[in-house]
Each structure stands twice: as C-alpha cells, then as structure tokens.
Amino acid sequence: MSGGTPRESVAVVVVTYNRADLLDRMLDGLAALTTRPDVVLVVDNASSDHTSQVLAARTEPWLRVTRTEENLGGAGGFALGVRLAYDGGWDRIWLMDDDVVPAPDCLDVLLAQDEDCLMAVREDRSGRLCEKAATRFDLTHPWVIKPKTRMVETDYGTRAAMPERVELENVAFEGFMCRRGVVQRIGLPDPSYFIFYDDVDFAVRARRAGFRIWAVRDAVLVRQLDFDQQHDLAGWKGYYMYRNLFAVHFRYGENALVRAKPWLVALVVVLLSPLRGGRAEARNVIRAIGAARAMRTLPPLSVD
C-alpha cells in the first residue's frame, strides 16, 4: 500500500476433505507468498485420510485448524470458516479449496485492488486459462436452461487477452476474496447447499446488495486437478446439482417464469428418463424439486 498506509489484514479460509497431499501442496503455496496472510484457517471436514498428520507436521505460526465432527460439505465448511474469519476481525477473507495453488504474488495483486469483492483467475498446470466464473449468469430469461451463459474462459480464451479486470456475475470459492463488510451486510455462505452453488448464492446476494465483483487478470491461481463438471446426474452428486440449481431459481429468479423453470426441467427429465438409460435421474430430480422448494426462503445467516 502506498503512502505508508498499513495493508489490510487477510484471513485465508481453506476447506478440505480427504485430499491430504493436495492440501499440503496448497499450504506450501501459501507459505511461498511474497506477502503472507495474517492467518490461514483450515476447516478439516472430518477427513478420514492422513489429513490430520499433514496438518500436524506443518510449522507455520499462522496456521489454525478446525476439525469438524462430521462432513459439513464444502458449503458448511466455508460457512464455518467465514464465521471464524469474521469473528477474528480480519479485514479481507480469501476463500480457497484444497486443490489450488496461488502464484507467489497473487495476494499482492489482489490487495492492490481497492474493491470489496475480488476473484483470482485460475489456470491449469500447463498455464491454460480455465476460469469458469460467469460473466453472465442469466436469471431473467426462462428459456435459458443453464443460467451460466458466458464465463471468463469462453469470453477471452487466454489470460493475455483479458483486460486488467473483468466484472463477474458469479464466483467460485477458489480464490474469491471479500472484505468483512460484505459478510456484515449479506451474512455467511449458506451451509444448507452442502455442495455446489453455495458460491453462486453468495455472489448473487452480494451483487443484489450493491457490491461489484472483479476477476483480476494478474492474480494467478493454479488448479491442480482437471475440471470435472459432468457429474453423474443419476448419482448422489446429481441430486445436489439439481436441488441447488432449482433453489437458486426459486430464490433469485427475476420473474415468475424463471422461478417456474425448475418444474419444466423436472418434467422433461422425468419424461426422457426411459430414453436416458434409467429412472435414477428421474428419482433424483423429483426429490430435488421438493427439497429445493423448502429452500426458497434464505435461512438466517447474519453474523450479528
């Protein structure tokens, strides 16, 4: 920061579950930052691998570990971590999954931006841009089945083609940073999502509260695993994908037709299930729409 102004304090929140070796590599990346965070809050979601041994072997004084008694999912882990960061009084809260590694200057680049909501830009291990945060998340038009219609990766193709900052309409909790005032205003991430769309929900709430979100081109975050967004919609993850997608539409659809879209999607899935190889997906979508209706109202998430 220029003019002798002390920099804002930073709490990193890392949520991990059964990926000890990736977590160790990620913590090495945090230790190599040219500007160190003030604290790293690791939420261990009741891992059953050697995560506890990896964490016990770390010697960084800024590392604090909270182990949950059960797996809260990514959503529950981030809700807990953000609560801890907020209660600790740190100025900025930087959210990380356990499979990303920041470039050494990543935190410096983010702290140079005087904005309330920021996103580091992800690339794969070969340096290819793979930032899937949405530049357009359409909750206005009912005929748009998948609301994420544009993203950084498809808009620009390469990091070099990006402007210095790109405005986003949703984020991923892999490199997202916000000031504590954002949490004070809109509350915590919603743990009821368990997995998927908790970051989308938080971004929608932030934007509707008047906060703008910026992806920062030169803040580099390296993803250690390939993206796998083609989940088995007939499996347990498929249930959460449908339920949480429907919940976002029920909560935030900008008109009645968009809020009704989940019913149409569910009907189509059920009707087509005999042609798609079985009825497991149909059972998932029927369960999902009932559960999503129960999520229409945002639960109490205030930090007060």
Q: Which residues are covered by each model-predicted region?
A:
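A short, conserved alpha-helix in the catalytic core of glycosyltransferases
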Residues: N170-V171, G175-L188, S192-A219
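Acidic helix N-cap motif at the loop->helix transition within catalytic regions
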Residues: D24, D49-A57, D105
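Glycine-rich, basic loop-to-helix element that forms the pyrophosphate-binding segment
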Residues: T68-G88
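Conserved donor NDP-sugar-binding/catalytic core segment of glycosyltransferases
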Residues: D105-D138
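Non-catalytic, C-terminal membrane-associated alpha-helical segments of glycosyltransferases
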Residues: W236-N244, E254-D304
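A conserved acidic beta->alpha catalytic loop
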Residues: G29, D44-Q53, E70, V100
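Short, acidic, metal-binding catalytic loop of nucleotide-sugar glycosyltransferases
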Residues: D28-P37
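Short beta-strand-to-loop acidic/aromatic patch adjacent to the donor-nucleotide binding site
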Residues: W90-D99
